[in-house]
């Protein structure tokens, strides 16, 4: 599914738009951690609670290392990540054929 990543600041993207064939209006939102250790601590806690939906991985577009988890809303996930790429006016748009350099394996309902 093609996605369009838009930004209004130095982050690679602030919002992404895509026509997924699912009833969700918002797929997920991201919380940015201060350290990679914060990501690890959050992963351990959410894994122990059985909330992980996608394992650790690194996105192709913004290079964020993150994982996904269920929220109290059945329709929205949270991405918890660290280390996103920043861009400026010299940034050139790049097309990617996959969402992750590594990881982000879906484990919904398996943990």
Predicted regions, residues:
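Core segments of cupin and vicinal oxygen chelate
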Residues: 1-13, 44
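Aromatic/pi-system hotspot detector in well-structured domains
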Residues: 13-15, 59
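Amphipathic N-proximal alpha-helical interface segments
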Residues: 17-19
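Long C-terminal interaction/binding lobes of large macromolecular proteins
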Residues: 23
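Vicinal oxygen chelate
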Residues: 31-110
């Amino acid at each position: 599914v093609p996605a369009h990543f838009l930004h209004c600041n130095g982050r690679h993207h602030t919002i992404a738009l895509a026509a997924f064939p699912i009833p969700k209006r918002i797929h997920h939102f991201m919380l940015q951690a201060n350290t990679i250790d914060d990501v690890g601590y959050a992963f351990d806690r959410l894994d122990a609670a059985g909330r992980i939906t996608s394992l650790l991985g690194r996105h192709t577009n913004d290079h964020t290392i993150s994982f996904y988890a269920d929220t109290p809303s059945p329709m929205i996930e949270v991405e918890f990540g660290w280390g996103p790429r920043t861009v400026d006016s010299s940034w050139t748009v790049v097309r990617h054929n996959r969402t992750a350099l590594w990881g982000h394996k879906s484990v919904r309902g398996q943990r």
